[in-house]
Amino acid sequence: ANLCDRVGADVEMVRKGIGSDARIGNKFLYPGCGYGGSCFPKDVKALAHTAREHGYTMQVIEAVERVNEQQKGVVFEKLRAALGDLRGKVVAIWGLAFKPETDDMREAPAEVVIGRLLDAGAEVRAYDPVAMPESRRRMADLPVRYAQTMYEAAEGADAVALLTEWKELRMPDWTH
C-alpha cells in the first residue's frame, strides 16, 4: 500500500491481482494501519527473540515487527501531510479495537495514532461500535472525546481516519 501511494497504483487492483494466486489468496491482503491484539504481536516478538537466543536472526519476522510499528506512524504522517500543523485540528477516529467485532484494544494501532495526534495538538473525536468503554478505561488520562455515532465524530472534523474496518464504517452515507 505504501508503494502504491508513491507510484500512483490502485492498491485494490494490486491486492486483487496478488490475491488471485491460489497459493496466497486474498483473505488477509488488506492495507491498514498495522496489526494488534493479544496473540499475533506477542507471537512474532517471541519467535524473533527465540531465534536470537539461538544465534539466528529471522530477518523476515523482524521486518514484519518493524513494519507493523512503522505503519502506525504512516497514518499520523498522512494526516499531518494533509492537514499541515495539527494544532487545533479535529481528527475523527473511526475504530478503536485492534480488529472488527471485538472490544479488545490490546496493541491496537488506534492507541498509538491517538497518542501522536494529541501530542501534536490535535483534538481527537473517537467512535467504535463496541470498544469505547474499553478505550475510556485504557485512555482515561487522555482528552479524547467519544461520539455516540460515527457521524457525530466526523461532524466538523478536518479529517476522518478509519483505523478498524468495521462493516458499518466502510461505506459511510455522507448525506446523513
Name each model feature, range by range.
Residues 1-176:
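Structural/interface elements that position substrates and couple domains in central-metabolism enzymes
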